[in-house]
């Protein structure tokens, strides 16, 4: 009798890295201390006992590089490779279509090399209880709303948070959210919590760590190298 996976992770790694300059390959393949950014992310999910399977959403142009990374670092949980879509929303939908029904789906950005195991575990447990969860950190900067070159409002940041990763969902909650988006013709959602809220669901906030940042620009990459060095010296948890 086949066993049913309890937790499946969809790791999004199909981007082209258009905002990351000076590299001839997408940023997920750029190295930090001789190791691809994507590999740091996959290390975490490979080592977590609660993760049963990883679906890797890829940039098909660089398909062989993904195979090489998984082979080199021995990622046994990566069982499925799925071509990404033209938007993040479409890429997640394709990953969701590629998995069998399970209890919890974890959606993770592949260019967040230092997502904490604690945050992932707590987000999974929160999704079991509330249906969906999002790892967030406090917004430290003042956020302003700008229109036509002028600041029109300054929201109170007391209740503002930056969405990090992962986002976690009961399988049926995420499936329903994407089905609702397709029916409503909603496109271009920047994350899946947005879709769950639009479909009438609730999303639990799970406090994360500032180390779970996303590498988007060259400055982020330089910062990641410093974070790695600080970890090695025991300056960070």
Where do the protein language model's features map onto the residues?
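SAM-dependent methyltransferases
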Residues: 1-10, 191-193, 197, 210-211, ...
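N-terminal glycine-rich phosphate-binding loop and ensuing alpha1 helix
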Residues: 2-64
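Residue-level signal for inorganic ion chemistry
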Residues: 11, 38, 95, 108-109, ...
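Hydrophobic C-terminal alpha-helix "anchor/cap" residues
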Residues: 42-46, 70, 99
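Short phosphate-binding loop-to-helix
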Residues: 71-103
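Short beta-strand-to-loop acidic/aromatic patch adjacent to the donor-nucleotide binding site
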Residues: 102-111
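Conserved core of the sugar-phosphate nucleotidyltransferase
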Residues: 114-206, 237
């Amino acid at each position: 009798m086949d066993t049913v996976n309890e937790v499946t992770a969809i790791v999004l790694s199909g981007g082209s890295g258009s905002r990351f300059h000076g590299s001839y390959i997408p940023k997920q393949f750029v190295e930090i201390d001789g190791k691809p950014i994507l590999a740091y992310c996959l290390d975490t999910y490979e080592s977590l006992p609660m993760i049963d399977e990883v679906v890797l959403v890829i940039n098909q142009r660089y398909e062989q590089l993904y195979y090489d990374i998984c082979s080199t670092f021995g990622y046994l949980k990566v069982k499925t490779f799925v071509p990404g879509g033209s938007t993040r929303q479409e890429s997640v939908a394709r990953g969701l279509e590629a998995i069998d029904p399970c209890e919890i789906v974890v959606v993770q950005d592949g260019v967040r090399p230092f997502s904490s195991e604690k945050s992932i575990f707590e987000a999974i447990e929160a999704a079991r209880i509330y249906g969906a969860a999002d790892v967030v950190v406090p917004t430290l900067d003042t956020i302003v709303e700008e229109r036509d070159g002028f600041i029109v409002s300054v929201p109170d940041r007391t209740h503002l948070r930056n969405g990090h990763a992962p986002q976690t969902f009961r399988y049926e909650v995420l499936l329903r959210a994407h089905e609702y988006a397709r029916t409503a013709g909603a496109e271009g959602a920047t994350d899946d919590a947005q879709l769950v809220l639009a479909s009438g669901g609730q999303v639990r906030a799970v406090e994360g760590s500032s180390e779970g940042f996303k590498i988007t620009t060259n400055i982020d990459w330089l910062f990641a190298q410093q974070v790695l060095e600080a970890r090695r010296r025991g300056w960070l948890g």
